[in-house]
Structures are given as structure tokens and as C-alpha cells.
Amino acid sequence: MFLDTKYRSNESEIMDDFALEGEILKEALDKIAKINQLLGGNHLTLKGVQELIHNCPVTNEITIVDVGCGNGDMLRTLADYGIKNNLSFRCIGIDANNFTINHAQNLSKNYSNISYRCVDVFSKAFEELKYDIVLCTLTLHHFKEDEIIRLITVFNANSKIGIVINDLQRSAVAYRLFQVLCFVFRLNTMSRKDGLVSILRGFKKNELVHFSKKLNVAQYKIQWKWAFRYQWIIKKVGDLESVRRKMEVKN
């Protein structure tokens, strides 16, 4: 059957309900994290962070915020990477679902440098949060265009070093392959439905370029990556050098 992916879908996902809770949600969060690991999603976001901090002094603390953090798997990956490479990361997970935040906290008890906040990204509390780097992994597609512009405007204003976005390519091939993954990983009904809707709410490269131009972003890079992802890195031009100097002064 022909699948039209010309335009983004407006269909909502079950997980868009921030009051959702229970074992079904917990299972979905953990399966999403596992699939993201196996398909290289965590590695893709980590590579983006590595690119952004390449010229930063490694002796200083870097605050990284993960928007739509899910079960916190990405932040634990970052924390492990930081420990292995003698980097000081302070990681903050953001999610609007309190059950999700509690689950992430339980899974991150052994990480003293990871904290979580149940916050609406369109609230004043989030708009006042400052950080060096902000991550948005498999989260941006949940928003409409005007919300995306508003959200990235906040990201750009409040981040000192840059932004790493990792999200889905909208394509019929990705849709069909995910149907196969549903069978292989025995995903529950919610995960199957939401996963397929997520792909239809994903992006074409020209749409991300359009957002970049509309936001008047000076330095950005958009690359297609396996498995049917786009890595969108926004660097704060001029700010990297000032951050480096401030860090050196602190030392």
C-alpha cells in the first residue's frame, strides 16, 4: 500500500499524554532506549556532543540538558563517557511526565552528576534554565512547526556552546522497517502505534534547513545518519571562544 510522506502528520501519540503512567509506559520507555542503543542513536548524539566540546578545556564542568529524556539512558551514556575520559559533566534530564522522571531517577541512582526535573518546556521555569549544551533526541518531532521555532529559540538563547538534535527521517522505507522491528522486539501496542506515528511526524532535510534559516542560525550542520535519522548540530558562533576564555580564567 502506498504511503504518502510528503507532509508531516498531525496525528498525536499515546505518549503525548503527560498523565500516562504504569508498567506499559515503563516497558515502552525501556524498549525505546534499547532500540535507540542498538540502532546507534545514543552514539549519534554522543558524537554531536564530542564535536561541540572539542575546543573546550576538559578541566571545567559542562552542563548538559536532555529535553525529553525518557528513562535517562542518554544521560547515563554521557555520564559514563565523561568518567571514562576524565570530563566533568553535570547532566539534567527534562520531561513533562512525572512517572517518566521517577523511572529515570530510579535507573540513575548510581550517578551523582545526573538530576531530573519534571518541567514543561514551554514553561517559565524551563525558559529560565541555563546550560552549556542542550540535547533533543527523538523529541522534536512531537512538536508542531511554531512550537519547534519557539523551542529552539529558547535553546539558542540559553545554551553557551550549542545544540544537538537527533530525530527521525520521514520516509516510507523507515516506516516499513520499523514494522519489522515491532515484530523482532515484540513491542507492545502503544510502542508500535507511537513508533509508526513518530516516523510520520519526522522530518525531511529541507524542513530542518527551513527551520535553521527561519531561526537565523549562523552555524549549523544537518546530516543523514543510520538508522533513518538526521543529526542537526547548531554551534554558538563567537560564544565558543568566550566560553573557553571564561573557563581558562576560572582556572
Language-model segments: which ranges?
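Class I SAM-dependent methyltransferase SAM/SAH-binding core
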Residues: 65, 71-73, 78-123
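A conserved beta-strand element that flanks and buttresses the S-adenosyl-L-methionine
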Residues: 135
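N-terminal, positively charged/glycine-rich alpha-helical extensions of SAM-dependent methyltransferases
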Residues: 1-30
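A short, conserved alpha-helix within the catalytic core of class I
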Residues: 143-154
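Conserved Class I S-adenosyl-L-methionine
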Residues: 205-235, 247, 251
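C-terminal alpha-helical "lid/dimerization" subdomain adjacent to the S-adenosyl-L-methionine
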Residues: 168-212
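Conserved beta-strand signature within the Rossmann-like core of class I S-adenosyl-L-methionine
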Residues: 160-168
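Class I SAM-dependent methyltransferase Rossmann-like catalytic core
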Residues: 22-48, 52-53
